[in-house]
Amino acid sequence: MSLQRSEKEAVISEVSRLVAKAQTLVLAEYRGITVADMTKLRVQARSNGVRLSVLKNTLARRAVAGSAFDVLAGQMTGPLIYGFSEDAVAAAKVVAEFAKTNDKLVIRAGAFAGKALDVNGVKQLASIPSKEVLLAQLCGLLMSPISRTAVVLSALAAKKGEGEGVGQAQAVPA
């Protein structure tokens, strides 16, 4: 069943809107995957802010034309699922994690910052911690010297407080 021209234009418009917001696009072949597994993948993706779509490749190529993801146009062949995410690593992370447990989902390619990524590039991108984790690690690094200084000063104050009480005479209750 083919789509009417107006339906095709609506799909291209919707995908173009996703492409405009996305930082990352991941392509994965889903040949032979069960509906139950695909549903699990979609739920996992949705909870991580990733939009998964099964699209006609010609419509997808038209939607990415002139965008940073145009570098993937030549690889848009066969049964593909397209993962779009506004977070730089979310799409790669969701697809790569799911592909580890389900061999029917095969990562084909990806794009980030206008550069095409091969399978290994997508896996490397997936191994990078999320923005929130990186910010937490940075805060921990920035707070570490301050906390160490506070601990040292506290220990010095405690030691000095103990030293003051040694030479003083204590009053004996009558």
From Swiss-Prot:
Any one Gene Ontology BP term: translation
Instruction: Kindly name one Pfam family recorded for this protein.
Output: Ribosomal_L10
Q: Which InterPro entries match?
A: Ribosomal_uL10, Ribosomal_uL10-like_sf, Ribosomal_uL10_bac, Ribosomal_uL10_bac_type, Ribosomal_uL10_CS_bac
Q: Recite the UniProt keywords alphabetically.
A: Ribonucleoprotein, Ribosomal protein, RNA-binding, rRNA-binding
Q: Does the keyword Transcription apply?
A: no
Gene Ontology CC terms: large ribosomal subunit
- The answer to whether keyword RNA-binding applies is yes
Among the GO molecular function terms of this UniProt record, one is: structural constituent of ribosome
Q: How does it assemble?
A: Part of the ribosomal stalk of the 50S ribosomal subunit. The N-terminus interacts with L11 and the large rRNA to form the base of the stalk. The C-terminus forms an elongated spine to which L12 dimers bind in a sequential fashion forming a multimeric L10(L12)X complex.
Q: Which family does it belong to?
A: Belongs to the universal ribosomal protein uL10 family.
Per its database record, what is this protein's job? Forms part of the ribosomal stalk, playing a central role in the interaction of the ribosome with GTP-bound translation factors.
Q: What is this protein called?
A: Large ribosomal subunit protein uL10
Q: Which organism is it from?
A: Verminephrobacter eiseniae (strain EF01-2)
Give the taxonomic lineage as stored in the record: Bacteria, Pseudomonadati, Pseudomonadota, Betaproteobacteria, Burkholderiales
